[in-house]
UniProtKB/Swiss-Prot annotation:
Organism (species): Orientia tsutsugamushi (strain Ikeda)
Chief place of localization: membrane
Entry EC no(s): 7.1.1.-
Subunit structure of this chain's protein: NDH-1 is composed of 14 different subunits. Subunits NuoB, C, D, E, F, and G constitute the peripheral sector of the complex.
UniProt GO MF annotations: NAD binding; NADH:ubiquinone reductase (non-electrogenic) activity; quinone binding
Protein name per its UniProtKB record: NADH-quinone oxidoreductase subunit D
Reported function: NDH-1 shuttles electrons from NADH, via FMN and iron-sulfur (Fe-S) centers, to quinones in the respiratory chain. The immediate electron acceptor for the enzyme in this species is believed to be ubiquinone. Couples the redox reaction to proton translocation (for every two electrons transferred, four hydrogen ions are translocated across the cytoplasmic membrane), and thus conserves the redox energy in a proton gradient.
Superkingdom of origin organism: Bacteria
Length: 396
């Protein structure tokens, strides 16, 4: 078969994008095969942030393993703690108090806002708009303050626990979160004023990185990447956990499967998160914030000061941990980036025999090649941003 005759003016070459590049959203190395300005192939090279998290977890007790999950997707840490806590609770068959469930849902939705504000702000920055970044970081600061007040940390919260949460909400926090819910929709509206009908923004996002329904399912996409293609799949609705089944909210889906649709879905999800948080505040009862089973939950400080048995129990839980019944379970949550899952295999000891982590960004990055083909180099930056990738969870 005769080879296709190439024009003497055409020039094909390979371009290395990253890993030290701000628009790759982490340590992504992309080898792009270019025909002039057009991308013919995109080959992602990952593993530069690999820390062996899954293996490290095997050497820790179930309680000691929780902080590792904050360091996976470090933009939305509490949602990953949530998945690990649910997996352990399934094996332990322990009941989570109602107040703790509402607290976990509320902070999961605050985490969703934390994630989406950063994604939209950095995506706008990548295409040349700087104002959204400044506006959204101001809002993120407020949520990080809520994190700090409830857990002592702005980022790596280590707040969720098997059976509940580590401590109750401090005085005045619930009122401050309610105030935030009243003013934040106006900030989203301001952001939409800047971007949604902006013709430059639409030129950079409409019909860029199109993913069909079939492609989204074939590549194992989830979250916004799946709903952007018109598939209404959200684990909070389809496989509800904690109190999501008792909360009223809508699932936003797109029509065209392009970067613009995915941006609109993230905007709508922030509105829905505010709606969920308001319901959590209204419905949250008084009561315990973690299970009262002494074999799982450490005693209160007031008890430790009065009872030697409580002190011994506290010491044993934090040093030796507790044994989890033998078995295996897969627990997944609707994290901001998609379905974050934890497969946990217990051999009946105080440490996981195996912990397999399913990160949504890993599947999404695999689809970069087919999404990028035929687009210009500048469009690749937009596609990387719309994938919403963080290499803590991809490389693990």
């Amino acid at each position: 078969m005769a080879l296709k005759k190439r024009s003497k003016h055409s020039k094909k070459f390979k371009l290395n994008l990253g890993p030290q590049h701000p628009a790759t959203h982490g340590v992504l190395r992309l080898i792009l095969e270019m025909d002039g300005e057009i991308v013919e192939r995109a080959d992602p090279h990952i593993g530069l942030l690999h820390r062996g998290t899954e293996k490290l977890i095997e050497y820790k007790t179930y309680l000691q393993a929780i902080p590792y999950f904050d360091r996976l997707d470090y933009v939305s840490p509490m949602c990953q703690e949530h998945a690990f806590a649910l997996a352990i609770e399934h094996l332990l068959k322990c009941e989570v108090p109602l107040r703790a469930q509402y607290i976990r849902v509320m902070f999961s939705e605050l985490t969703r806002i934390l994630n989406h504000t950063l994604n939209i702000a950095t995506q706008a920055l990548d295409v040349g708009a700087t104002t959204p970044l400044l506006w959204m970081f101001e809002e993120r600061e407020k949520i990080m303050e809520f994190y700090e007040r409830v857990s002592g940390s702005r980022l790596h919260a280590n707040y969720f626990r098997p059976g509940g949460v580590s401590q109750d909400l401090p005085e005045g926090l619930i009122e401050n979160i309610a105030d935030f819910c009243e003013q934040f929709p106006c900030k989203i509206a301001d952001l939409e004023t800047l971007l949604t009908d902006n013709r430059i923004w639409k030129q950079r996002t409409v019909d860029i990185g199109i993913v069909s329904k079939q492609q989204a399912m074939d590549w194992g996409f989830s979250g916004v990447m799946l709903r952007g293609s018109g598939i209404a799949w959200d684990l909070r609705k389809s496989q509800p956990y904690d109190q999501y089944a008792n909360l009223d909210f809508d699932v936003a889906i797109g029509k065209n499967g392009d970067c613009y649709d995915r941006y609109l879905i993230r905007i709508e999800e922030m509105y829905q998160s505010i709606k969920i948080i308001k319901q959590c505040i209204q419905k949250m009862p008084a009561g315990e914030i973690r299970t009262q089973d002494p074999s799982i939950s450490p005693p209160k400080r007031s008890e430790i000061k009065k009872s030697m048995e409580a002190l011994i129990n506290h010491f044993k839980l934090y040093s030796e941990g507790y044994n989890v019944p033998a078995g295996e379970v897969y627990a997944a949550v609707e994290a901001p980036k998609g379905e974050f899952g934890v497969y946990l295999y217990s051999d009946g000891t105080n440490r996981p025999y195996r912990c397999r982590i399913k990160a949504p960004g890993f599947a999404h990055l695999q689809g970069l090649d087919f999404m990028a083909r035929g687009h210009s180099l500048s469009d690749i930056i937009t596609i990387i941003a719309t994938l919403d990738i963080v290499f803590g969870e991809i490389d693990r």
